[in-house]
Amino acid sequence: MMDPPSFSRRAPSTQLSHPILGCDSIQSWKCDYMPTSHVAPKTLDEYISAFSPEVQAVLQRVRQAVCSAAPGAQETISDRIPAFRLNGMLVYFAAFTKHIGFYPPIRGDSRLEKAVSRYAGEKGNLRFPLDQPIPYGLIKRITRLRVKQNRAKHTTERKKK
């Protein structure tokens, strides 16, 4: 059995921007989970196994919340973080030192936008602090909204063809 990849913080650079997380600098997103060997995790299990047992438990529950809200969604790794596809990219999540990040920003449902506002980061992406209860029910609501949005977009694109 292979050892999990080595993860550590990288030196800052302002020349790159993360396409999903929406950060202005690479310093913001190349955090503790980024492999120093430049080898990205290939599966969600591999990604999750690199963390402490406490964080692994949280990540597994986030994964379960997404799976239950989006039956049939395909697990993948995109930009070195866990992601789900269903009629296109659905949601992403990542573990950081003090929080779980959940992406993309929520748009299109004012009630849900209000519900997530306390967790909104600078770019509208969500940050769930690890020292507070993780709102798994809210993660399910967000995922269901994204399923609905992706389905509508997919249907519209198919009609154009």
Describe each model-derived feature in a short phrase:
Residues M1-T14:
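Extreme N-terminal basic, low-complexity initiation segments
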Residues H18-K161:
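Charge-dense, helix-prone N-terminal extensions
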